Amino acid sequence: LLKGVIDCPDLPLNVSRSALQNDGFVKKISDYITKKVADKLTGMCKTDRETYEKYWDDIAPFIKFGCLKDEKFAEKMDDYIIYKNLDGKYLTLKDCMDKAKEEGHENQIYYVTNEKEQSQYINMFRSQGMDAVILKHNIDSAFITHAERYNEHVTFQRIDADLTNDMKDESGEDLTDATNALTDLFRKVLDKKDLTVKVENLKDENVSSMVTLSEESRRMQDMMKMYGMTGMDPSMFGGQETLILNAKHPLVQYILKN
């Protein structure tokens, strides 16, 4: 993408890492290279979007890492970070926000981290005409926090973090008795006294159940894994899964009757 040579006769002959890290000329060179890379990338996105998209999957982790490490680089690249959606199209953050507004969840961007594991949720989203972006690299967990900080009012939420209103059938049916009965049953069978159970009428009658985990709890768990705190109990941070049962599904109806 970018080739060249930088001539700097003022660099010290001592090339030890500690000396170079504290050298003013090295810092200037680093800033200059960062600027040239950002200029090249933004220019390509403006004038040759097709080529930019072709390279994106390979260079995205490095660009996102650069945004996390260098504030000036992040400012230059903010409008040129692109996200692949469920149809394989690349969208800027502004495109994602415009699409979210059209779908009725303004400022809320849904994302997928594993297309196979979350296929059921993806199918439910597609059936309601909703879209999501694919963020499956390890760095994406930290990057979406960065994107939310730099873009006021923007929030990212994984598609299995909660049940959206678009997926519910607001029939007005009282499900209190069903919820109480199924909560007692599943807590006993699964031996989880604190299990949260919700019973909803879902539009998709083929889905019997879903398990959701709040975005905040998921990010806390991701942070624990990142910093090697896997031995700690996630429940100490208040993050617990919620079991959602579809009252329209024959299996759930059978359990209620029997």
Predicted segments with their positions:
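Conserved GHKL (Bergerat-fold) ATPase module
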Residues: 1-258
